[in-house]
Amino acid sequence: MQRRDAIKNIMKDIDDELVICNIGFPAKELHDIADRAENFYMIGSMGLASSIGLGVALAKPDKKVVVIDGDGSFLMNLGATVTTFVQNPNNLTWIVINNEAYGSTGNQDTYAKYLDLVDIVKGVGFKHAYNYEDIDLREVIDDDNLSFVEYNVYPGNSQVPIIDISPIEIKKRFMKVLNK
């Protein structure tokens, strides 16, 4: 299974949740699979989808928030695991699609192949950290706990067009959803 398949599977369990998606190919694949106003596509700022997701979860405690991240971005911003744990938003599910590669820059290896990301976040203090194949994602999202999910896939990018919405329009339509 590749990242695009993982995103399709994830989106089958998404209803009205707010989704913050990692930069590059993951954002383009999500846009191609299930574009909607509740999706915020990162166009830049590698490593910060988790931080933006945390901010949205804290600002909108009545809404469920799902972050779709990559292993490269996760490793780039490991400090976000500590901040997220300490803030402990019970409406946030942080999914890291681990392809052991920087998919958007040419599939160079990350160090994720030497690590267990679930063990890392458990070491920080996360009490609800899972491998995707061991859970029902809908149940995890519905649970009122901060959760982390690692989704292991093979490297590779699908042939998808660029996102045809400007960054300003992505922000405007997402903010409109937030302000409802």
Place the predicted regions along the sequence by residue.
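Thiamine diphosphate
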Residues: 4-5, 13, 32-176
